[in-house]
């Protein structure tokens, strides 16, 4: 029994074949109607004239073919240029073989003639050869488009596969055991697995299973992995598609794809439909007139999720980074009954994720995963996986047998700032500036109770940064107080403050531009979002969407000026705090800067040693002695044989 899909494909090819036949008939009739039958005398006259003008030219004769017809008849067909009309005329001449030989008289043909000793059908085939070539070329293009569309999962129901469902059923082999660090989110989804396995139990209790689950969170937190784990645990079909795949250049295609996707899921029920980046298709509908393709697609999705039809056994899961831009009709109960926040992992969750991804890798048993988790605040699960992958690559590059904390530490730096640029030339002045700048950041972290803890300081360039300081929160809390935010801003401004104190206000460099950007962003949020300024407990929206998609500000120019003044006030107060701390701890600043100049990178343990003992660590003193001896040899003109493996390079 033929399916609806195969029938539509058959009709498509029948229409194409009919169009080709009609085209051939029209061309044949047109050619036949304009062809003149000439006598042997006319043919002889044309043959006697054209060679006299230019026997080697192909000006007068075109597309001439000669073939043998019935009863020893010679048929000559082609086009001849008439000087009287200035145009070519299509002709056909029927000659006896003897008459043809008399006219030609053993002369060379004045045209590139084609002689066929065969049937009339063969000659007709040759005459239609150019047309057949075009037909085959056209058919090949159609076949290629059909093949491509079908291979891409678009189906072959129409010429481009538009409107066809791009999601295909697959069985997921991911389990909850493959997902680490988001235990609360997993517990929310256990009920879905139970419903998909035992739907009758919920029906007897009169309970309705959630029709949809929306997962919101930053990129790389495991939203897609969770959806696959639900399908894998339940053992049901898993349909996945990106929100952008619904749309095409033609209006209505997205709605058609939504319908077919749900129809396919019904055939495979129980099933899960997962829509990644649903904000691409589920954005809020504006108040403007008209109904574009996006709105049609959204409307169809709303109907399929909770309309007149029934989609029993189908659960829609979706992921987005921007739930705030989704249409309210999409978020109501009955469509997405549950909205799960998948946030960035905390320190314990990061430790669990690292341990999960460490399986199957050769890692030194002395690696403390809790310490590694401390160094990676704000990292997503995807970034943590990338850290261990980079560490494995470094192990192979360095031709080592196991991954040590050295490779992991370097991998974290590579993920944060990119590969180190040790070959970048840096003058002594630049090195001094960067050393004091980064020491300023570290000093604020050491002396301010609310500031972040310093984990590492380096002056080795990475990316666009001449150096950087890694600081992590002392305690990973959910909320931040006004005091905490002031301390964070002071930490960002500590580098600029150190430059001003050491080199003067007029010699402050551009190295603090990124610090200023981050500090200003926090200060602005304190004013316009958190109500932490003299403007009071008011949230100022910078832009608002009005009717017909028009965007307008929500406050006056006078208020904007007051907001800018408050931001400047917060930055100035934080900068004064940074200046005060650095001036009171100049000895520690000098020791930190000297350690950076010598080692280029100092760890949390070395920083704490300097802060407590007010002297340089042993590693710094040893390196200074080696450098002094080498300088002495250079002054004496001695040749120094330095091997790469002898250099103290991290």
From Swiss-Prot:
One of its GO terms (molecular function) is ATP hydrolysis activity. Disulfide bonds: none annotated. It is found in: Cell membrane. Its EC number is 3.4.24.-. The active site is at residue 438. One of its GO terms (cellular component) is plasma membrane. Its cofactor is Zn(2+). The chain crosses the membrane at residues 11-31, 124-144. Pfam families: AAA (PF00004), AAA_lid_3 (PF17862), Peptidase_M41 (PF01434). Residues 1-10, 145-650 are cytoplasmic. Binds 1 zinc ion per subunit. Zn(2+) binds at residues 437, 441, 515. Its main location: membrane. ATP binds at residues 217-224. SMART domains: AAA (SM00382). Residues 32-123 are extracellular. It comes from the Bacteria. In the central section; belongs to the AAA ATPase family. In the C-terminal section; belongs to the peptidase M41 family. Homohexamer. This is ATP-dependent zinc metalloprotease FtsH. The lineage of its organism: Bacteria, Bacillati, Mycoplasmatota, Mollicutes, Entomoplasmatales.
């Amino acid at each position: 029994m033929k399916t609806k899909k195969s029938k539509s494909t058959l009709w498509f090819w029948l229409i194409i074949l009919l169009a080709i036949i009609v085209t051939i008939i029209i061309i044949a009739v047109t050619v036949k109607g304009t062809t003149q039958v000439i006598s042997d005398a006319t043919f002889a006259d044309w043959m006697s004239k054209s060679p006299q003008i230019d026997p080697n030219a192909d000006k007068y004769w075109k597309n001439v073919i000669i073939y043998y017809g019935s009863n020893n008849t010679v048929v000559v067909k082609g086009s001849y240029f008439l000087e009287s009309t200035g145009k070519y005329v299509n002709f056909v001449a029927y000659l006896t073989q003897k008459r043809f030989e008399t006219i030609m008289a053993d002369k060379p043909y004045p045209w590139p003639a084609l002689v066929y000793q065969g049937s009339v059908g063969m000659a007709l085939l040759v005459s239609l050869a150019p047309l057949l070539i075009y037909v085959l070329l056209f058919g090949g293009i159609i076949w290629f488009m059909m093949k491509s569309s079908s291979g891409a999962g678009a189906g072959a129901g129409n010429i481009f596969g538009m409107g066809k469902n791009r999601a295909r059923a697959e069985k997921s082999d991911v389990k909850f055991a493959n997902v680490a660090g988001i235990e609360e989110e997993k517990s929310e989804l256990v009920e879905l697995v139970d419903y998909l396995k035992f739907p009758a139990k919920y029906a007897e209790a009169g309970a309705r299973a959630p029709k949809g689950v929306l997962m919101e969170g930053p990129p790389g937190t495991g939203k897609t992995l969770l959806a696959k784990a639900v399908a894998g645990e339940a053992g049901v079909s898993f349909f996945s598609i990106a929100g952008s795949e619904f749309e095409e250049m033609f209006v209505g295609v997205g709605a058609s794809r939504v319908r077919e996707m749900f129809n396919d899921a019904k055939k495979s029920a129980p099933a899960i439909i997962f829509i990644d980046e649903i904000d691409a298709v589920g954005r809020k509908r504006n108040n403007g007139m008209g109904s574009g393709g996006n709105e049609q697609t959204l409307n169809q999705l709303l109907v399929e999720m909770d309309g007149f039809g029934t989609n029993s056994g189908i659960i829609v899961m979706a992921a987005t980074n921007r739930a705030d831009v989704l249409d309210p009709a999409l978020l109501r109960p009955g469509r997405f009954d549950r909205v799960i926040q998948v946030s960035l992992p905390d320190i314990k969750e990061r430790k669990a994720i690292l341990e999960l991804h460490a399986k199957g890798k050769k890692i030194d048993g002395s690696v403390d995963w809790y310490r590694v988790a401390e160094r990676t605040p704000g990292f997503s699960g995807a970034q943590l996986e990338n850290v261990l992958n980079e560490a494995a690559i470094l192990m192979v590059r360095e031709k080592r047998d196991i991954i040590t904390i050295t490779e992991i530490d370097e991998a974290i730096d590579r993920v944060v700032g990119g590969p180190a640029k040790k070959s970048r030339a840096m003058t002594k002045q630049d090195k001094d500036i960067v050393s004091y700048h980064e020491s300023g950041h570290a000093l604020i972290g050491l002396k301010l109770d609310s500031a972040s803890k310093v984990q590492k300081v380096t002056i080795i360039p990475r990316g666009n940064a001449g150096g950087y300081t890694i600081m992590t929160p002392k305690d990973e809390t959910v909320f931040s107080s006004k005091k905490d935010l002031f301390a964070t801003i002071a930490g960002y401004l500590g580098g600029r403050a150190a430059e001003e104190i050491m080199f003067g206000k007029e010699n402050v460099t551009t190295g603090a531009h990124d610090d200023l950007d981050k500090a200003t962003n926090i200060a602005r949020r304190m004013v316009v979002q958190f109500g932490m300024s003299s403007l009071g407990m008011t949230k100022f929206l910078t832009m608002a969407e009005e009717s017909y998609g028009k965007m307008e500000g929500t406050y006056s120019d006078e208020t904007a000026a007051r907001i800018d003044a408050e931001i400047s006030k917060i930055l100035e107060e934080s900068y004064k705090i940074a200046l005060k701390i650095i001036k009171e701890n100049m000895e520690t600043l000098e020791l930190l800067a000297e350690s950076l100049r010598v080692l280029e990178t100092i760890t949390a343990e070395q920083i704490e040693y300097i802060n407590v003992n007010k002297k340089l660590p042993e590693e710094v003193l040893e390196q200074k002695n080696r450098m002094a001896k080498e300088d002495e040899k250079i002054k004496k003109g001695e040749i120094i044989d330095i091997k790469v493996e002898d250099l103290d390079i991290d």
